Amino acid sequence: MSSRILDDIAEEARKGSFGTGEDQESVIRGIELLKRQKLNVAFVGATGVGKSSTINSIFNMDVAKVGDRTDPETASIQKYEIDNMVLWDTPGLGDNPEKDRQYAVEIAGLLKRKDEKGDLLIDEVVVLVDGSNRDMKTAYETIEHVVAPYIEDPKRIIIAINQCDVALKGRFWNNDRCEPEAQLAAFLDQKVTSVRERIAGSTGIATSPMYYSALHHYNISKLLLAMIIAVPEKKRFLFTDSLNRNPDVWKKNDELETYNQKIQQEVKGSLSKALEGAAAGAAAGASIGRFIPVIGPVAGAIAGAALGFLGGLLG
């Protein structure tokens, strides 16, 4: 499946929008190389933690293609493809010890799988933690025994605490403002610290847990930024075609950082890096930066149509 945005940019390059000769060919070659890339993300967590709702919040599942389950080694894992994105929704853990053992073997098999180049297939793992549950045993066992042993770079592990709105049984969640009040925010900050320290103590891995609410679309941009930064820089642009087109999803985040602007910067930098690394046309990166209006100040007609949904991130 091809990237629609990259197809549009390649078409503009063929028209000479980014120069002619070697610069033009460099952009086209770089785009063609990027179009052959796949970005694989696995979602892991306990039953009821909200893997499906999280995936639906971040990604445009209306156009997702459902993969088959013919591989007996990963029969319980659901695969979705959205252009160059491949999402792996693993079965929930913690309900049945016998099934947990089966699922753990399947998840481990997925995390150990190699692509045609011999590299690990999965680019990152998003481990979801239930913010409403004080019993974190399943979450910690999943991280320690199922995920951590098979991820070479711990920076590729995202710890995301979902259901932050009900972490105190719904108390101190402001429904009108769709955000936690001070008491709940303080409790969630403590949970983040506790989870980080527990993971470090049991695995030796340094993580940066964050909390969000898939139901209320709170801190979805924060989660997306963490996911983008965790993958190789040249692949970060591949998120763009797959994202949820509903601008309301991206509006409400905490104010610790300007997540939406940073997302745009990462997308711009990723495409520039991919093109610069492809051939001698190093100036293509800056040209593409101007070409994409939502990650730069200048609007272009085709780019605006292709990437307009990201404009909601600026809101």
Name these PLM-found stretches:
Residues I263-G315:
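Membrane-active amphipathic alpha-helices enriched in small hydrophobic residues
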Residues M1-V86, P91-L271:
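Conserved GTPase G-domain substructure that encodes guanine base recognition and part of the catalytic core
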